[in-house]
């Protein structure tokens, strides 16, 4: 109530949101936009036309419900940066070299965005920017407004990055990329290899310059929003908040703002399967009998590895949903699925989704009893929020951090056994890391009837209940949104 009373005596807050052009970054940012708009904040999302089209339907429903959200388009300078037309999203890139060009294009957005901001009404009160868009720091400075960073990762990961950026000597002392080390001052004893942590010392050349810009912009930002909740990783939230002088607001799981079926089904993109067809298939299966398999929107595993995954799923003799991403690998895999007889042999107990999956809708169905995931933070949270135990198959980035949080700290899943980081564009040379027996073993471990499996399921269900409580009135995440808005209101008031 105190917040609402304060709200009446000030001009409306206007937050400008800058999502990075990658599906895993855009999805939670759109959720954050809706959560803030539900509190009476005017929201402007700045993105490119291609990326805006991905969340058009979800936002249109939000706008029709009375929320003050608008989307401003800026042209993506693909040609000037050496990219092909349509390469406006990381989904369409397949190498680290192209990513360098992509970041070059991103930084070219500074001037058109500056002009856009000059014309915005009402005057922006605050920027929320993805960590990967350091140019927004210059925008915030130019207009004398606070910039809040959104990373899209866990506090577990953020704390490890914060500590290691200030203790470079630990990584420099390692004799090889495969040698394990402990992160000092960490709440739990967790070992990493050098490549399993996302720190700027792992990069050189153009990539080091990109990372330096991002870290510097992060260090000078006003604060950080994290898509997590207090009861999930309390020690890491506490330590990271202290490291950032208190300006950290954990407001997740933001996915829980998706209440209706359409929002769940279309979160991130239009689903490649009819919602009713998907639900009908799940309704025909026993409770907790289905394994859901999705390795993310940027999975470039070689065909040989995908074949082993498929054969492992077949060997489990359990019903499964397998999401197969688009692109070149899809055509190769689709050919194998058809010609090898895999689809025919498993058709009575499998559902293959070729493209974007209605993941939230699937995970929240009672028939789903396990989730084989790449450990992207969005997917990790969606699985935990739905009370579904996880099988971890990390590929790169923060995903190895998330695996260790899931398996070692939360004890909410089991690892499929992957410890080697996939280097973008070099997947074929890495080859097969998990054979079909390894896949079957992990699935049986997570979905079996051992005491450990039962305890794990109980633990994940409890975490799922805590996730829902966090976003309800009086919950930690619900309260943190109020604290965030009060903080920004005080900033506005001090300048008026």
From Swiss-Prot:
Residues the record lists as binding UDP-alpha-D-glucose: 297, 357-359, 374-382, 396-399
EC code: 2.4.1.-
An annotated Gene Ontology molecular function: UDP-glycosyltransferase activity
Broad enzyme group: transferase
Keyword Chaperone: no
Domain of life the protein comes from: Eukaryota
Any Pfam family the entry gives: UDPGT
Assigned keywords, A-Z: Glycosyltransferase, Transferase
Family: Belongs to the UDP-glycosyltransferase family.
Name of the featured protein: UDP-glycosyltransferase 73C2
Origin species: Arabidopsis thaliana (Mouse-ear cress)
